[in-house]
Amino acid sequence: MTDRNELIGVAIRVVAAAAVSFLSVRYLVKYLDPNYSVNEESKKKVAQLFHELGIDRQIELSEHEIRIATQFVGGEDVGADWDEIGGCEELVAELKDRIILPLRFASQSGSHLLSPPRGILLYGPPGCGKTLLAKAVARAAGCRFINLQVSNLTDKWYGESQKLAAAVFSVAQKFQPTIIFIDEIDSFLRDRQSHDHESTAMMKAQFMTLWDGFSSSGDQIIVMGATNRPRDVDAAILRRMTARFQVPVPNAKQRSQILNVILRNEKINNTVNLGEIAQAAEGLSGSDLKEVCRLALLARAKATVASGGSVNQLLPLEQSDFESAVHKYMRAAHLLVEETLD
């Protein structure tokens, strides 16, 4: 009996020691891993995104791939319809011909000449719809869309940035067809200099090497960049971005079309002449015009509330509302230019 009790006691102590060791190791891993909290948050976000996008959650991802997968665009931001983009008919037609059609032909044709370009550059002044166009392309082509935040590729631990750069392409490959979108690409892949930090230079080199590798394969992966400073982009990157599209400041006709898109769900008086407003808004971009419309509606709402009315009882917008908003916005822009010159 004594021997039996001793054996039971030993067994209990062994089990207790094993349990304590397991919990200790678990907590040590938790507190010693510098990326533990980031990885846990990434797992939760990826699970939610995959549910929204209908992606198979059984696909295995490494911890670096999970961090990249958090940058899939899902929900309401998954893409834009072509009719949400005003004033870009010629550009939209060219994007359809050079990108959308080749993506559809890729699985049907054996010719590499019918494959889509592996690198696309959208360049032009700020606020002209480059990001919106990129999302519209992804939606029309049925592609997954990774809105790559370059800050997420940087890590203070040696070698981690290169692993994250590799994860960008491995994630894109697992969920292809995929568009990897890099906004302000000039800030990430700008001209390399001898004084660049070693880790940054290595990450750029890794990114370009992987890009070349996928370009020579049959994978449907497209890197799309947007910039308002194309001359600052590294020449080696420009060589890889064979399809380049200028997104210019809209002219008067295009501004009128953009205003129609922005105001299509708003109450406007029949006497409003959007053509005249577009003429008065010379030099304004699409995002500028959206702000002008917001100012016009805000002024109307303020006047309605001041007179004792409700925001839900707004009268249709008048020509004068838009004229005042354009004048106010243009005046602020002019003052900003003067301060910059001073």
Swiss-Prot record:
Membrane topology: Single-pass membrane protein
SMART domains: AAA
Domain of life: Eukaryota
Record Pfam families: AAA, AAA_lid_3
Transmembrane segments: 7-25
Keyword Nucleus in record: no
Binding site for ATP: G124, P125, P126, G127, C128, G129, K130, T131
Compartments in which it is found: Mitochondrion outer membrane
Keywords attached to this entry: ATP-binding, Membrane, Mitochondrion, Mitochondrion outer membrane, Nucleotide-binding, Transmembrane, Transmembrane helix
Parts of the chain on the Mitochondrial intermembrane side: 1-6
GO cellular component: mitochondrial outer membrane
Role: Involved in intramitochondrial sorting of proteins.
Protein name: Mitochondrial sorting homolog
Organism: Caenorhabditis elegans
This protein's encoding gene: mspn-1
